[in-house]
Amino acid sequence: MIPVVALVGRPNVGKSTLFNRLTRTRDALVADFPGLTRDRKYGRAFLSGYEFIVVDTGGIDGTEEGIETHMAEQSLAAIEEADVVLFLTDARAGLTAADQAICEHLRRREKTTFVVANKVDGIDADSACAEFWALGLGEVYQMAAAQGRGVTNMIEYALAPYAEALGLNRDGDEDEDEEEREYSEEEAEAEQKRLQDLPIKMAIIGKPNVGKSTLTNRILGEERVVVYDSPGTTRDSIYIPMERDGREYVMIDTAGVRRRSKVHETVEKFSVIKTLKAVEDCNVVLLIIDAREGIAEQDLGLLGFALNAGRALVIAVNKWDGIDQDIKDRVKSELDRRLGFIDFARIHFISALHGTGVGHLFESVQEAYDSATRRVSTSMLTRIMQMAQDDHQPPLVNGRRVKLKYAHAGGYNPPIVVVHGNQVKKLPDSYKRFMMNYYRRSLKVMGTPIQIRFQDSANPFEGMNTKKLTVSQERRRKRMMTHIKDKK
């Protein structure tokens, strides 16, 4: 399960700056996900081989009343969900009463906490950070989030003790090399067999009261999950193993994600974290949309998170029974207009309550998983690359034509194609999209996003120790050149 890192601290200590750097966004507001409280932001981060969810819990004012209300209502539940807590302080401002009050709450939670002294640029960092040792939470780590100094080392140190338990790769470079290396036929076949033998993890996500638990019960044929006509019945993600048509599955019924203004209870506010972790943990996402309400911003937010995670996708429009034909036409038109960018995903119109169309969902889930784990040979990928070049030549870069040499599989679930060549990293985004769509059409990939990575081929002579000619060698070279000229 992907770990959660919570950023805790008083206002203006640099939490949003660190959040933006970890999530590689320019504005923390772009990660202000529907369903979270106003002061909480989340994002998906990948740094130095570690993949994790980072949560900014918002500033805490430090007053007794503020600590009791803000910490209890917004931050304590987030800290409970977190695997690691980064307690940010301001090295320039020094230790304050607010820092000490927050420290007391963190100590009572008995969570793994790292004290981070931010804004150490331009000052005597060791002297400025000395007083933070009085907090009694262990070593004080120095960081300048705005410049990125110390960020990578901090994350590596914070997550390294849990790397094995959380299934993380300690060395990011090794992970990248493994991901982009060319599989041999035996290795590719073994990897595909391993994936095919594993149960398919299918996460059912969507807004509250769209019928996720009803669909789960319909599939299982039993009242396994509590169903009630009220949003927020499911508070946690429920993992349910099952078998269908000789294939093993693990269904994940997740809590719904609502608009922030409609989220009042603390326990519900943070159930969204479990939903996001379930998306990271699954193989196929089944997004449920309410036909009566149409596509909401929460649906698009969940859809974006699933795509960013590279998960295979199936969409089910629920409550399709009992609505007028003109409403059905309007919903289909809206789906075409707003979901045109995911034309690879199958869309089903179902009634979870009555079972209409539910049986066909598994056909699309199986198809999406097969596409995500399908093995394609290097020769086939290279041949498709050559066909794409013939149809549309790469553009000129610095007066030279970009040359694509060969392609190979770089990974599964989602399928990754690595294209090697000269100056390929300088290709414009438009040509990269052309290549991605060309591979999708040629391979007939359905139900899963496909990733195209471009790798510049290494110069075989780069770094070679070219020795300077000796005096005798230089004279001999001149005699040979003179002899060649005389012959002409």
From Swiss-Prot:
Coiled coil: none
Subunit and interaction comment: Associates with the 50S ribosomal subunit.
Regions of compositional bias (Acidic residues) in chain numbering: 172-189
Keyword flag Plastid: no
Residues where GTP 2 binds: 206-213, 253-257, 318-321
Gene Ontology molecular functions: GTP binding; ribosome binding
Species whose genome carries this gene: Shewanella sediminis (strain HAW-EB3)
UniProt keyword terms in alphabetical order: GTP-binding, Nucleotide-binding, Repeat, Ribosome biogenesis
Domain called EngA-type G: residue spans: 3-166, 200-373
Domain KH-like: 374-458
CDD domains for this protein: EngA1 (cd01894), EngA2 (cd01895)
Protein family: Belongs to the TRAFAC class TrmE-Era-EngA-EngB-Septin-like GTPase superfamily. EngA (Der) GTPase family.
Function: GTPase that plays an essential role in the late steps of ribosome biogenesis.
HAMAP family: GTPase_Der (MF_00195)
PANTHER family linked: GTPASE DER (PTHR43834:SF6)
Identification of the protein by name: GTPase Der
Gene3D superfamilies according to UniProt: 3.30.300.20, P-loop containing nucleotide triphosphate hydrolases
Residue segments, region Disordered: 168-191
